[in-house]
Amino acid sequence: IDFLYVGSNSLDFEIPGTLGIIQHHSITESKPRHYPLYHFSDIDFIDSDDKSFLVCNHMDNVFDQIRALKNCTLIVYSDQSHGIHNQRRFITELMNQNILNPVIIRRTYKGLSKEEFLMHSSVDVGGLQIDGLGDGVWLDFESDRSYVNQTSFGILQASRTRISKTEYISCPSCGRTLFDLQETTAKIRKRTDHLKGIKIGIMGCIVNGPGE
């Protein structure tokens, strides 16, 4: 995680590593790596010299004002079910106008199971990331945060935006596999899951395996 949003709260402990803290602009503290968050209605209060974050809807016309805010990161959200198209159009317009501010893609999901959340977010966010659109991900979901984080990093990894873990590519197994492929894959994972950025192919076929 690069940034942690705490809303109007404060942290009473030392920030670990290089983690940045995002707070609502009305209470942002003058501490290292603390950054204010604004909404589009508050854009006139943004100091162009300070690093900041701006939440905007795909329908907000930020293009003229954002030119002067070179240190501002845009958090672009859509509350529509097919928001991927709206966010794509918004980011494309930024590129057409040569606006180079970083963009975080934000989506919120409610009333879904974990599996549905995984599928929806992978399509909505991954569909943009795979085309090189967006610099970060912000997912909101009614579930444990560890699962949301795991899903976020999985999308970033699958789109080759950020490599954070070992990747395993295994054949689906068939009658030509003479050993327990799932058990073998589990053993390999146990020994190698610390090798960040490595791709490991696991072949079980006695015909194609040796050649590949």
Regions inferred by a protein language model and the residue ranges of each:
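Catalytic alpha/beta core domains of metabolic enzymes, predominantly
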Residues: 36-43, 48-202
